[in-house]
Curated annotation (Swiss-Prot):
InterPro entries: UPF0325 (IPR020911)
Family: Belongs to the UPF0325 family.
Name of this protein: UPF0325 protein SG1947
Native source organism of the sequence: Sodalis glossinidius (strain morsitans)
Disulphide bridges: none
Amino acid sequence: MYDNLKSLGVNHPDDIDRYSLRQEANNDILKIYFRRDKGELFAKSVKFKYPRQRKTVVSYNAAEGYREINGISPNLRYVIDELDQICLRDQTEVDLKNKILDDLRHLESVVSNKIAEIEADLEKLTRQK
C-alpha cells in the first residue's frame, strides 16, 4: 500500500500530517510534513521537485494551429492521490472525535437540566406537606 510514497523514500506513511503543493517556474514543488514528536519545535518535512509535463495540443483557433500547455506530472498525481487518502482519513477521525465530544457535552447539559427539574419538583412536594 502507498507504493508511490514508498518509492519516494517515505517508509512510514502513517506519520504524515499534511502536505503542500506549489508551482515554481516549470516545476511543481511537493512538501510533505510529518507529525512532530514530543519536544520537537518544528515538524520534519521532505521536499520533492517534479518538472511540469509539457504537451502540444491543437488550438481551437485555426489561426494559431498548435499551442503548448503545461500540466501536472502523472507520477505526482499518483502521489497526491495517496496523500489525499492519508490526510482525509486523519481529518475524518478528527471530525468524528469532535462530534462525539459535542454529543457528550450536549448529553451532559440535558442530564443536568433534567436533574434540576426533578429537584425543583421534589422541592415543591416537600413544601406542600
